[in-house]
């Protein structure tokens, strides 16, 4: 498997340290089989992925956005999904949350849409609480 990456601030050295090859934004969209988005929402990232980027993707490619909805232009994504220009999308972030009942993402057969709470589980919260208590004890022991 080849891991490619792009970021406005990434250096070739940082990509290599992460086990990836730095490519241009255009190359990322043209080459990726599975494209995952891991960015914070800011004025620089809002609308970063629009129709031009999505239309560069392979028809067999899949997009995963678990960052923030407005990073991907929602109407452009709906368009490429409806037209089967990409194989599918997995998303748990949307322009409007909760996702309205009539939203197209709910009916497209090439969309996996979930709430942005996929990490929530009993085991995870147990770990959070145990780690918190452990950290407090360690701090108290040294002060």
Model-derived features with residue positions:
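The conserved SAM/SAH-binding core of class I Rossmann-like methyltransferase domains
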Residues: 6
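Rossmann-like adenosine-cofactor binding region
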Residues: 9-104
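Residues at the starts of beta-strands that form the adenosine-phosphate
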Residues: 1-2
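C-terminal helix-to-coil terminal segments
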Residues: 95-143
């Amino acid at each position: 498997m080849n891991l490619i990456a792009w970021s406005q601030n990434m250096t070739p050295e940082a990509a290599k340290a992460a086990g990836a090859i730095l490519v241009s934004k255009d190359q990322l969209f043209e080459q990726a089989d599975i494209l995952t988005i891991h960015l914070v929402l800011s004025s620089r990232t809002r609308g970063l992925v629009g129709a031009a980027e999505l239309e560069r993707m392979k028809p067999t490619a899949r997009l995963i956005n678990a960052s923030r909805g407005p990073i991907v232009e929602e109407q452009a994504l709906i368009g490429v999904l409806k037209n089967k220009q990409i194989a599918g999308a997995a998303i748990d972030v949307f322009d409007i949350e909760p996702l309205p009942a009539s939203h197209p993402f709910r009916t497209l057969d090439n969309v996996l849409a979930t709430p942005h709470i996929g990490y929530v589980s009993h085991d995870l919260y147990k770990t959070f609480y145990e780690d918190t208590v452990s950290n407090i004890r360690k701090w108290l022991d040294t002060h």
